[in-house]
Amino acid sequence: MEIRLADSKDKQKIIKYDNHIHHNKVGECIWNQLVYVLCDEKRIVGVLRYSLFWQSIPFLDLLYIDEDYRGKGYGRQMMEHWESVMRTMKYDYVMLSTQEDETAKYFYEKLGYRRIGAFLPPEQDADEIMYLKML
């Protein structure tokens, strides 16, 4: 398995997994080196996309692992890789959010993320929990 920065030829595969932003924005994120992919040989089986909250704080926007690869530690590997890169880039902490009713919150808490607040977006039925991790 390999974790690498996404490039333009990965765009269509990434769009398949990332329906949280408009497909035109995916190319922009790739260009700005904000997307990592997990590859099994040449096949993309995971995607991690982030942005900069307030243009200064790395914020995880998406972590997706193909269903056949879940529960095998690849999500943890992608998170650790991203955190390592952010540390190298001299960031002191990273942030993310997930819905209160999603099991992902337990995954992030096991990785050392701590809850720093929550809000209820009008389009959701559950609170969106904000997390922070010191690097």
Q: Which role does the model predict for each range below?
A:
Residues M95-S97, R114-M130:
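Conserved catalytic-core motifs of GNAT/GCN5-like acyltransferases
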Residues M1-D61, D66, V85, P121:
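Acetyl-CoA-dependent GNAT
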Residues Y108-E109, Y113:
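Conserved active-site tyrosine of GNAT-family acetyltransferases
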Residues K133-M134:
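A general lysine-centric signal
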Residues M78, E102-A104:
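Conserved short alpha-helix immediately C-terminal to the canonical SAM/SAH-binding motif I
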Residues Y69, G73-H81:
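Conserved acetyl-CoA pyrophosphate-binding loop and the N-cap/start of the following alpha-helix
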Residues L63-R70, Q99:
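A short, internal acetyl-CoA/4′-phosphopantetheine-binding micro-motif in the GNAT/acyltransferase core
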Residues M86-T98:
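Conserved GNAT acetyl-CoA-binding A-motif
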